[in-house]
Regions:
Chain B
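Helix-loop-helix units of permease transmembrane domains in multi-pass membrane transporters
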Residues: 90-123
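Aromatic- and glycine-rich beta-strand/loop motifs that create alpha-glucan
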Residues: 1-29
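Transmembrane alpha-helical segments in integral membrane proteins
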Residues: 75-96, 101, 172, 180-182, ...
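A helix-boundary/kink motif common to multi-pass secondary transporters
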Residues: 18, 97, 110, 179-180
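Transmembrane helix-loop junction
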Residues: 15, 94, 107, 138, ...
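Terminal transmembrane helical anchor/hairpin motif
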Residues: 2, 39-67, 185, 193-272
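Secretory targeting signals
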Residues: 29-86, 116-187, 196, 241, ...
Length: 294, 276
């Protein structure tokens, strides 16, 4: 079973402490979203995991191998897409992928098959034989994701993977991550600014602020019992199954009482003549994030 | 290890020879070669006039051949400097400036392997560029002086090859210090063409001493194997004969020292490089 151990990692840039005593152990396949404001230390952490930066203190073990002391061995299990990816501009996408595949020990024929497969998944098949210097930001992002998946790594580290993508690209990227998590059983660490993205893709969320992990919990534990309902209401003031009901225009926010279900609340509303347009479940993630991050 | 090295070398070489810098150098070498061919035929009979001591004198064909090769080699010894500046100066700084380090540092390959692969790729494209000039030189020589090339020519080419390794290593060292390509370009030019020249003038004028330890002086052995004349106005120990064996060995040693020291320091810096 793959494992990632982050043990007491701190990072200083001069007098600035970018990371403070970060500890994290991941030994089961899951997707971990790292949330935090700009400058919180998310990317610094991912860079230390991928040997782009060295920790000032502490260590990172990949399957028990110290990334700082034996990077060649430790990084065999890692695929990474860190910051906005840039490639050697005079190599084509195919050559870039082949370069990485061959370095990861794949044969020439094996790497060709892998390239076709990953290009198809990430939607860059038609661009494979163009020089990467001619790629758009979004295409580079897709190529970066394809490169990070070469050799089927056990741990995938992605730094804001949907950055620079159009809405369709963002959706496709999230679908790829969900597939990697659910079908391939990989450990995925990815940073994002988007709470909705973390909610959709991740099993666990870590909130980082000012170089510290402020929160680390499973998404399932953050599911709340709040609902947001949009529709047309006739001065509705009270619903027996709900508490903390607030009405604002054509929107009601409420919290279900213990034992109540979403269906029972909706039934009550409809019996009171409410026409419902949309219903949205609300979890605690946003609340938690805003309470921790100043 | 060897396999990963050859893969790295192959891809870097490909990235180099497709670059604009390569085509710019190719254009430069073709222009310079063309100019040298023209000058060779235009001033063939005035070859002795290039050396003040021989001005207006009749000289033997052997010396004429040596002078011909000296002048071609004089230009040749500067070509690797320009090529190394184009290919070597941005070698490491560009990984930071162009952000490609974010792609290569997380790969399961030693940074020393990456650096050496890139270094040899850079040396290779410089060799290709200089080879074009040398081919034109040989063809011109054979037309002007039918017969075999002298052994000294091959000595000069061997020394040039060492110089290419040496100057490329030096530019890699400079590149490893900076995060911006422009700073690396300027620094190499400043050191090689201004600081070294200034040191030459100071040592030769004030102390009448030949600063053999400077890389540009060591590189001049490429032409001095034919005729031991330095173009510096203040140069000491000029001679119509080729450089002595000891002078060749000293120059060779200096170039090898620059090569080894530069590569070792560049490796150490690259190994510990961080990208914020």
């Amino acid at each position: 079973m793959p494992g990632l151990d982050i043990m007491g990692v701190s990072k200083n840039f001069g007098s600035l402490q970018a990371l403070k005593d970060i500890n994290l152990n991941v030994d089961t396949p899951q997707c971990i979203g790292i949330l935090g404001p700009n400058g919180a230390g998310k990317t610094t952490l991912l860079k230390i995991i991928t040997n782009i930066l060295k920790p000032s203190e502490g260590k990172i073990l990949v399957n028990g191998v110290n990334v700082n002391q034996n990077p060649t061995k430790a990084l065999e299990k890692i695929g990474a897409l860190v910051e906005q990816p840039e490639f050697y501009p005079y190599l084509t996408g195919r050559e870039t992928m082949k370069f990485v595949a061959r370095i990861k020990g794949m044969s020439v024929s094996g790497s060709s098959e892998e390239i076709e497969k990953l290009a198809s998944i990430t939607g860059i098949t038609g661009y494979l034989d163009r020089k990467t210097g001619e790629y758009s930001r979004g295409m580079k992002q897709r190529l970066g994701l394809a490169v990070s998946m070469i050799g089927d790594p056990e741990i995938i580290v992605l730094d804001e993977p949907t950055f620079g993508l159009d809405p369709r690209g963002m959706k496709e990227m999230r679908d790829i991550l969900i597939t990697l998590k659910e079908e391939k059983k990989r450990i995925i660490l990815f940073s994002t600014h988007l709470i909705s993205e973390a909610r959709e893709v991740c099993d666990r969320v870590i909130i980082v602020d000012k170089g510290e992990i402020k929160f680390n919990d499973e998404i399932s534990d953050m599911r709340g019992n709040k609902m947001r309902i949009r529709g047309s209401f006739n001065n509705i003031k009270n619903i027996p199954g709900a508490k903390d009901l607030t009405t604002k225009g054509n929107e009601i926010t409420l919290e279900m009482k213990p034992g109540e279900t979403r269906n029972s609340i909706l039934r009550e509303l409809m019996e009171n003549g409410v026409e419902i347009d949309s219903v949205e479940g609300m979890d605690r993630m946003e609340e938690v994030y805003l309470s921790l991050v100043q | 290890m060897t396999n990963r090295f050859s893969i790295t070398y192959g891809y870097y070489f490909r990235n180099y020879y497709r670059s604009r810098s390569f085509y710019l150098m190719l254009l430069l070498v073709l222009l310079v070669s063309g100019l040298m061919v023209y000058l060779s035929f235009r001033y063939l009979n005035k070859l002795p006039d290039f050396i003040p001591e021989l001005k207006g004198k009749a000289i033997s064909t052997g010396l004429k051949e040596e002078l011909f090769l000296y002048i071609w080699a004089f230009v040749l010894s500067d070509l690797p400097v320009f090529a190394a500046v184009f290919f070597g100066s941005p070698a490491i700084s560009s990984e930071i400036e162009n952000r490609t380090a974010f792609q290569i540092f997380p790969l399961p390959i030693g940074r020393s392997v990456l650096l050496m692969g890139k270094y040899l790729a850079s040396v290779s494209v410089t060799l290709v560029i200089t080879a074009i000039y040398i081919i034109v030189e040989v063809i011109t020589y054979i037309i002007v002086f039918p017969g075999q090339l002298p052994v000294t020519f091959f000595k000069s080419i061997g020394l040039l090859a060492v110089f290419i390794f040496s100057i490329s290593a030096f530019t890699f060292l400079v590149s490893s210090i900076f995060k911006k390509n422009l700073y690396a370009y300027i620094t190499v030019f400043l050191i090689y063409f201004i600081i070294f020249s200034a040191m030459n003038i100071v040592f030769e004028l004030i102390y009448s001493y030949n600063p053999f330890f400077l890389l540009d002086n060591a590189a001049s052995i490429v032409e001095r194997v034919f005729v031991n004349v330095s173009t510096s106005t203040f140069a000491v120990n000029n001679s119509i004969a080729g450089a002595s064996f000891s002078s060749i060995m000293v120059a060779l040693l200096v170039m090898i020292l620059y090569l080894v020291v530069s590569i070792v320091i560049a490796l150490l810096i690259f190994e510990n490089k961080e990208v914020k």
